[in-house]
Regions:
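Metal-dependent amide/peptide-bond hydrolase catalytic core
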Residues: 101-286
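Histidine/acidic-residue-rich, glycine-tolerant segments that coordinate divalent metal ions
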Residues: 1-3, 9-141, 224-225
Length: 286
């Protein structure tokens, strides 16, 4: 979609007053490419004043668009917990210090941070998605490794949950004669916050292309995006473009192994990109 927009904008550059930068997303999935790009000056020379992005959504009907002003996407952080015990024969657990039992207790107890410590009026997620320990049925291993993710709609919420994850994991490990090493590898993504004016502009640009009834407001979701590194610096808007179509079995969302795109949406996305850029430039030169 962005390559298509590049071609159209280039073919019409003599009619455009201003500069449009087209930014792709290296290392978006966990690598915080947006942070690296920002640090290397992608928003400078010339200075970028507004920024817009589209993300496909397989569960939204083809040709629809949705977003909102304010916080759209969550701040995110990775979790890694290494539980250390003392392995031995599974038939003699009393001669071991079992990290699997301890790790299991940690997984369960972390959920109470959301249900019992987070305000019901706030949003937060702790999901342990990987648990690795041992390689034999008759051996209690010496270590268990847990990995997962934390989500919150604020950076402050992420920091608070990180502190409590560390405290809870280490305390449970001590109570069970184990040791827990807790880390948060990689980069913490900030929340993606849409500027109100940019959403209004993006909404109008999308309605020109898709139609009034195809553009709507949506609720915040707990996914994360490295686009957030840009909106920390300048006003911007991140929107979702529907690519779903049950007639071709395009009904699964991103990250699903059966994810499929109705490619008719791609040309619409290109047109939305172009119209948004033109409207933004017109608005900035008024």
């Amino acid at each position: 979609m962005l390559l298509g927009a590049a071609r159209i904008l280039k073919e019409n550059e003599d009619k455009i007053e201003g500069t449009v930068k087209l930014i792709f997303q290296p290392a978006e999935e966990g690598g915080a490419g947006g942070k690296m790009m920002r640090e290397q000056g992608v928003l400078e020379k010339p200075k970028v004043r507004q920024i817009f992005a589209l993300h496909v959504a397989g569960t939204m009907p083809m040709g629809t668009l949705a977003s909102k002003e304010g916080t759209l996407l969550a701040a995110t952080s990775s979790i890694k917990i290494l539980v250390k015990g003392n392995g031995g024969h599974a038939a003699a657990p009393h001669h071991t210090i079992d990290p699997v039992v301890t790790g299991s207790k940690i997984v369960v107890e972390l959920q109470t941070l959301i249900s019992r410590e987070l305000s019901p009026l706030e949003s937060g997620v702790i999901s342990i998605t990987m648990a690795n320990a041992g390689s034999a049925t008759n051996v209690i291993p010496s270590t268990m490794e847990l990995q997962g993710t934390i989500r919150s709609l604020t950076s402050e919420g992420i920091s608070k949950l990180q502190n409590r994850v560390k405290e809870v994991a280490e305390s449970i490990a001590i109570a069970n004669r184990c040791e827990a090493e807790v880390s948060f590898p990689g980069n913490d993504y900030p929340p993606t916050v849409n500027d109100a004016g940019c959403w209004e502009l993006g909404k109008a640009a999308a309605k020109d292309i898709l139609g009034q009834e195809k553009v709507s407001e949506m609720d915040s979701i707990m996914g994360g995006e490295d686009f957030a590194y840009y909106t920390e610096e300048i006003p911007g808007c991140f929107s979702f473009l529907g690519v779903g179509n049950p007639e071709i079995d395009a009904v699964y969302d991103v990250h699903h192994p059966m994810f499929k795109v109705d490619e008719e949406a791609l040309s619409l996305g290109t047109a939305v990109h172009v119209n948004t850029a033109i409207k933004a430039l017109e608005n900035l030169t008024i």
